[in-house]
Amino acid sequence: HKPQEFDINGKLFLIGHGDGLGPGDHGYKRMKKVFTFPFFKWLFRWLHPDIGVRLGHYFSVKNKLISGDKDARFLGEENEWLALYCRKKLQEKHYDFFVFGHRHLPLEIELNNSSTYINLGDWIQYYTYGEFMKTFKLKEF
């Protein structure tokens, strides 16, 4: 769940899924509170898996309806919550690349002259992936 730090060929990466990081992603954070609350975890253990899967799907869809499309669209570089998270991390430590995927949007945002935030997008809608040679680039297939 927590982003992991990697040194690859002298470049420092912070890599993670990206869920729940930064000031946005309210729908995910709301859903996570429910699913990690001890009473609901206890209750969930007593449900038949078929019912548990249906409930999980129901709350996931309901969460998306509550959040609307705000969580699914690009908010601009100044409002993109994972970019804001990356900028905050840069105040603590230098990273060359931040790589996440939670937003499912292909994004490549230069944070400063030596740090870049890359959101990998997805292979279903955008056909995007990341490639690291001497630098990290977002590519399409």
Predicted regions and their residues:
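Active-site neighborhood of phospho(di)ester-bond hydrolases with catalytic His/Asp-centered motifs
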Residues: H1, I15-G16, F97-H102, I118-G121
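Conserved catalytic scaffold of divalent metal-dependent phosphoesterases
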Residues: H1-E92
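Binuclear metal-dependent phosphoesterase catalytic core
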Residues: F6-N9, P106, E110-F141
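Structural motif
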Residues: K11-F13, F97, E140
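Active-site environment of divalent metal-dependent phosphoester hydrolases
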Residues: L21-P23, F97-E110, Y126-Y127
